[in-house]
């Protein structure tokens, strides 16, 4: 694996599979927050300590394959340009917070299933991504990496509290489980706000596709746990999975309701969005996300034949500003991005139809 491949292949290998409930659930993510006993928290550490953590991982973990993930590549943020960092964020391989740090780094597995972020809010944040609803499988992989690291270093751990983390809400298991979910039915039936309120009352958090402070572009929401203290990893996963399954049921019910009561209007909306994607010469990222969401819904409901749902997922990633500019070989102005985005979508849909 090389930096060029990571940058030039917009679709991570894990995105190409279809997991359970993939018509509604795009991905499952597990993140484990860990800190080393001998170092200050990342928020307080100096440059020397940050470099020591880089060297520790370079010495003990780079070029040492872990089955079934293969070898890991070390990417230091201060060795990447702003565009490269943005691409990693848009591929969900690092957090926006890590992209903005000077001494952060990331270890990526060959499949990009596993991302180990260094010197973010915590010394180590292990992230594991799976397609569809596969929280338990993602947790199993994350725990395997966690054990691999803990064989070489000593974590900050308290017998009564659990893992010590920079943010109090992560103290305990240090586990943040999240699911990326496509909910156009609930948005169109105007039930989404009520659903979000119920989710929040259950102690879960609803965010946009890039986490805290981001928008829910294309009717895609991220649902995650909030507190970890006093609960086991298995309980956190079970609770989140139960809520997600209820949301899936509500989304399917909403879709059925729209088809029964507003079938022609929905079909018109789907095909109008398809027409925009297939014919536009300029399209902004927000409009593209909305149209892609409509067309994906049309595919799921059988209105549109001959186009793979995965193509829509691919285009949602490919049309992000950073990845567009990476493909172009450098920075683009807003109108240039809109032109290239529209061209890319038209060409990709044309290839799919042929």
From Swiss-Prot:
Q: Which reaction does it catalyse?
A: L-arginyl-[protein] + ATP = N(omega)-phospho-L-arginyl-[protein] + ADP + H(+)
Its Gene Ontology molecular function terms? ATP binding; creatine kinase activity; protein kinase activity
Phosphagen kinase C-terminal domain boundaries: 24-254
Q: Which Gene3D superfamilies match?
A: Glutamine synthetase/guanido kinase, catalytic domain (3.30.590.10)
For the motif RDXXRA motif of the pArg binding pocket involved in allosteric regulation, what are the positions? 337-342
Q: What EC identifiers does the entry list?
A: 2.7.14.1
- Superkingdom of the source species: Bacteria
Is Nucleotidyltransferase found in the keyword set? no
Question: Which biological process terms from the Gene Ontology are attached to this UniProt entry?
Answer: phosphocreatine biosynthetic process
Record bears the keyword ATP-binding: yes
Q: Which UniProt keywords apply?
A: Allosteric enzyme, ATP-binding, Kinase, Nucleotide-binding, Transferase
User: Binding positions for ATP?
Assistant: 27-31, 92, 125, 176-180, 207-212
Gene Ontology CC entries for this record? extracellular space
* Stated regulation of activity: Appears to be allosterically activated by the binding of pArg-containing polypeptides to the pArg-binding pocket localized in the C-terminal domain of McsB.
Q: Which family does it belong to?
A: Belongs to the ATP:guanido phosphotransferase family.
* UniProt function note: Catalyzes the specific phosphorylation of arginine residues in a large number of proteins. Is part of the bacterial stress response system. Protein arginine phosphorylation has a physiologically important role and is involved in the regulation of many critical cellular processes, such as protein homeostasis, motility, competence, and stringent and stress responses, by regulating gene expression and protein activity.
Question: What is the protein name stated in its UniProt record?
Answer: Protein-arginine kinase
Q: Which species is this record about?
A: Bacillus mycoides (strain KBAB4)
